[in-house]
């Protein structure tokens, strides 16, 4: 059986959940359509997702049509859940991008299409709600060409009056875009030679698979118009990115989820081989796990299975699998474009509204952060505050609501601050000698530090001979330095510098690697005190798409948000602005942009790097370490 994995993506109220229900119903997977209002749909059925109108976590359902099984991966659509978006897109064989015939291309549609193009996912456009009053499809087509891609192939003829009717094109007009994109076909066409349907279909298929052509279909999920045809398109146009025939097992973990009973589930896309119940499987070329229970989606329901084939999405109950873990042979993973996860840029302090719920809050955060790598937290052991780092405002709002709905914990949140970094100001060296108070460790370490250009990261080298100090001691020094770099003089991560291990002394047999591991961060702190450090703040590159009338306001507002506009383009009645902005200003800039353009703008951002800050340094409390803090205090007292 052919197995394909698709995503249905859309802006709010475009009808994504209704379309998914219609696909399940028309294929016979379910016998009754679910209701969004009643929360009986197979996807987006939590109270939180219904209230916000957005998908928050990846969900899975499925249907079977003839000899093809289709897994539908329900994908989040908000920028604050970008890591979840890219993880779920990475397992797709194709996507349906839903566009409301009444609303046209919205800001969120463009963000989703940007992600699909970036990941190289073959995509079909589906114009939904064509049965609503006042629809002008020519305007929607133009909107798509201007804001998404001009390389579309309209596959159907639509009559809106007196009754809505959708029929597939049979004449040659649909092939214009295909012919224009191929020099050989265009030359044949211009010379009057006939073009075979087969060669046109092959060219369309090639360009569709490499994401340079986008077929466009129509319908109404609510009124069941065009759904049967869409099912045929899904099963015929999308190919599975799996290894056929006998091969080694290969699968990738793309989602971690906790059930209401606190069971930990790992979602895995299989790319090759067969996974059997009770198999012992190697994970990321290291330890092995035993498959004790295995589930998959069958006609919209999760069912226990005893084997799963290449292409399938399986769910294992397991305490040890992590996001992006690879089961089996890592070399068999598809070479899809790798997208780096965005870094959390903000942090805040959280506490339960009811102090007696502190342990419940910590348990909940442990589960949520296990599922979402963009949420991190730690407990300050001096102040006992819970420090949470995250990506954006909506993500924090959703986490707060999730804690209340699923875990029954209400929280208080302080005003978020940006996560800074530190860089040494100048070259410096420092050595702490063995048996010289207050050093209690059986180790001598000498370090030097040198600043590097912005964006260089932390570089480490050792000039101490392995012939004198063996690898286990050398590794311990490097581990201690990495730990020390997590907190500079102002409490932030240290970067953009070169640290050299220049001198080491040990006493045999009393010295151990632990002595060197404990002493290294203390020496590092002292050498940083000699060098001094400066604060770096995160900057984002941005690209704004807005109506042309916003151009003058954009330039006038830029200084208010410390934004620097470096490029301006005018295209299709839009202004496209590119530049950079401090991360601390982007939330307000994006909100004001949405307000002044009445929601007709899009702001895409990526981390550009870190720039030196001005003004008073921003400090954060150090995370204490009971094993070395007393020694740190003694050295700080004498230096």
UniProtKB/Swiss-Prot annotation:
Pfam families: EF-G_D2, EFG_C, EFG_III, EFG_IV, GTP_EFTU
An individual GO BP term: response to antibiotic
SMART domains per UniProt: EFG_IV
UniProt function note: Abolishes the inhibitory effect of tetracyclin on protein synthesis by a non-covalent modification of the ribosomes.
Binding site residues for GTP: 10-17, 74-78, 128-131
Residues covered by the tr-type G domain: 1-242
Protein name (record): Tetracycline resistance protein TetM from transposon Tn916
Keyword terms, alphabetized: Antibiotic resistance, GTP-binding, Nucleotide-binding, Protein biosynthesis, Transposable element
